């Protein structure tokens, strides 16, 4: 079994309010209070140590959204924010990994990936960020699944990413 641990720092102020998520299995809201940390220009590879120092706890991700895909890897994340960035740290354990999408805004959803959703303005427009285990990123924004627009490369280039498996696509087996 591989341990994959990847981390991405979202270098934009997307959401400074407490985050909430609905668990469709039991329709209960889970509220997370996102801690503000006072740092600037932190190297992305230093984020796990910073979150350790700030005692930011990991939260489990244990909801299966699609009955057709019942497999659930062991996933946990932690989140904090600075004045101008959201810091995300994901740890994922699963039986096998895949990272074939080798360029941003590619089909990372076909790889081993995690997602982060945010509605920063409360206006119904949400941001969907998907990152595969090699740090390849897809960012879309829109009011629904069908009409999201992908972020331009100059925005994607501002997102700092680090992956414990490295940043190169993993070859298909």
List where the protein language model places each region:
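Bacterial Sec-dependent N-terminal signal peptides
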Residues: 1-29
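Structural preference for beta-rich elements and adjacent junctions enriched in aromatics
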Residues: 26-173
């Amino acid at each position: 079994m591989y341990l994959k641990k990847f981390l991405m720092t979202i270098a934009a102020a997307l959401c400074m309010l407490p985050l909430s998520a609905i668990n469709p299995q039991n329709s209960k809201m889970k509220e997370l209070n996102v801690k503000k940390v006072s740092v600037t220009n932190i190297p992305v590879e230093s984020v796990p140590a910073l979150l350790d120092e700030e005692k930011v706890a990991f939260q489990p991700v244990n909801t299966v959204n699609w009955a057709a895909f019942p497999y659930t890897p062991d996933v946990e994340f932690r989140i904090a924010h600075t004045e101008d960035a959201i810091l995300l740290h994901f740890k994922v354990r699963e039986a096998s990994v895949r990272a074939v999408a080798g360029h941003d805004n590619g089909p990372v959803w076909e790889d081993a990936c995690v997602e982060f959703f945010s509605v920063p303005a409360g206006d119904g427009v949400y941001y969907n960020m998907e990152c595969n285990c090699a740090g390849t990123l897809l960012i879309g924004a829109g009011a629904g699944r069908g009409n999201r627009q992908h972020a331009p490369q100059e925005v994607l280039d501002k997102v700092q990413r680090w992956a414990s498996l490295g940043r190169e696509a993993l070859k298909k087996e």
